[in-house]
Amino acid sequence: MARDYYEILGVSRDTDKEELKQAYRRLARKYHPDVNKEPGAEDRFKEINRAYEVLSEPETRARYDRFGPEGVSGAGAGFQDVGDMGGFADIFESIFSGFAGGMGSPTQQRRRSGPARGDDLRLDLKLDFREAVFGGEKEIRISHLENCEVCSGSGAKPGTRPRTCSTCSGSGQVRRVTRTPFGSFTQVSTCPTCNGTGMVIEDKCDACDGKGANQVTKKLKITIPAGVDNGTRLRISSEGDAGQRGGPSGDLYVYLFVNEDEEFQRDGINILSEIKISYLQAILGCRLEVDTVDGPVELIIPAGTQPNTVMKLENRGVPRLGNPVSRGDHMLNVLIDIPNKVTPEERELLEKLAKIKGDRTGKGGLEGFLGNLFK
C-alpha cells in the first residue's frame, strides 16, 4: 500500500504552501543521490519528489485529499531531468547552490538563460447566490502580460538578436572565489549586466521597449461549475503572465465569493429559509407555495404543526460540486404568526373554541397561545 504523501513529507494535511516547500527542501537535500550514497536513498528521493509534485499543485492536492493516490495516478510528468522541472528547479538551486564549486552549475547555466515560466495571476470574482448554485458562463476582464507580437517575445528589434552576455558568458551568474587558510570558497550571484538572463539586448524592440511583453487587457468567458461556494478557486490554464525566452505562460486563479441572498441561506449543500403561516393554518393544516432556487414549489403543512418545525424539500438544495446530479435539500423553518388583535367576529369564534377546549378566558387569566388574543 502506498504511503501517505503528507506522511512522506512529514507535514499535516492543513499545512500551507510555504511549510510544504520547506519540508521538501529539507528532505531533498538529505536524500539527493549526489549527496546520500546509502542504499535506498535514491528510492526515498523519488518518493519525496512524487509527494511534493502532487501536493504542491492545488488541483492535484485537492484530488489527492478526496480520492487518495488513485485520484492522482496520472498527475505530473515525473522527474526525468532537473532541467525540465519548472518550479522545482528554483528549489533545487536553493538547496544545492551552497555546495563548493557550485554543484550542478551546467544545469543552472542552461536554466537561467533558458525558458522561464510566467507568473500566476489572481482575480477575485463575486457571484450572485443562484449563480453559485447553478453555475454557468461568466465573462471576466483580465490584465496580463502577453508576448510582444513585433519581436515574438525576444525584446530585440526585428532583424536583430540578443547577444550572449560577455560578463557571465551566458550563464546568468558571476562567481567569485575567495581563498582562505581553510580552503577556497565560491560565491555565486546574479550577473548585474544581464540580470541573470545570460543575454544582452543592444537594439531594443520599440513596441515593448525591450521587455519582450506588453500589458494587455482582454475579456474571457469562463465556466462556473454548479455548487461553488465562498473561497472556491478555479484555475484558468495559461492565462497568467507570458513566460520569458519562450517559456510557458502562467495560470490565472479565479477566487469566487458569493453574495448573500435576502431569502436564502446556505449550509453546505443544503439551503435554508423561513416560511410564516397563520395560527389557523398551523392548527388546520394547509397547502401553499414556497420559493426555492428552482422556483415556486407546493408545500403541504400538516395539521397541528408547531412553531419552528423544520420541513424538508428533498433535492431542492445545492448541486454537489463535481457531481451536479446529486443535490442537497431545502430546509424550511416554519414560523407561526399570532396576531396581536382580532376582530369582534373572530373573538366570538375563538371564545367558543376556548370553551370547547376548556381554556379559561377573560381578564382573570388565560391559558394557551389563544390567551394573548383576548387581552
Swiss-Prot record:
Localisation per UniProt entry: Cytoplasm
J domain ranges (all copies): 4-68
GO biological process entries: chaperone cofactor-dependent protein refolding; DNA replication; protein refolding; response to heat
Positions contributing to Zn(2+) 1 binding: C148, C151, C205, C208
Binding positions (Zn(2+) 2): C165, C168, C191, C194
Repeat region (CXXCXGXG motif), residues: 148-155, 165-172, 191-198, 205-212
One Pfam family of this chain: DnaJ
GO cellular component terms given for this protein: cytoplasm
Cofactors, names only: Zn(2+)
Zinc finger CR-type: from-to: 135-217
Coiled coil: none
Keywords of this entry: Chaperone, Cytoplasm, DNA replication, Metal-binding, Repeat, Stress response, Zinc, Zinc-finger
Gene3D superfamilies membership: DnaJ domain (1.10.287.110), Heat shock protein DnaJ, cysteine-rich domain (2.10.230.10), Urease metallochaperone UreE, N-terminal domain (2.60.260.20)
Keyword presence, Transport: no
Swiss-Prot/TrEMBL domain comment: The J domain is necessary and sufficient to stimulate DnaK ATPase activity. Zinc center 1 plays an important role in the autonomous, DnaK-independent chaperone activity of DnaJ. Zinc center 2 is essential for interaction with DnaK and for DnaJ activity.
Quaternary structure annotation from Swiss-Prot or TrEMBL: Homodimer.
Similarity comment: family membership: Belongs to the DnaJ family.
Biological role: Participates actively in the response to hyperosmotic and heat shock by preventing the aggregation of stress-denatured proteins and by disaggregating proteins, also in an autonomous, DnaK-independent fashion. Unfolded proteins bind initially to DnaJ; upon interaction with the DnaJ-bound protein, DnaK hydrolyzes its bound ATP, resulting in the formation of a stable complex. GrpE releases ADP from DnaK; ATP binding to DnaK triggers the release of the substrate protein, thus completing the reaction cycle.
Protein name in UniProt: Chaperone protein DnaJ
Organism: Nostoc punctiforme (strain ATCC 29133 / PCC 73102)
Taxonomic lineage of the native organism: Bacteria, Bacillati, Cyanobacteriota, Cyanophyceae, Nostocales
Gene: dnaJ
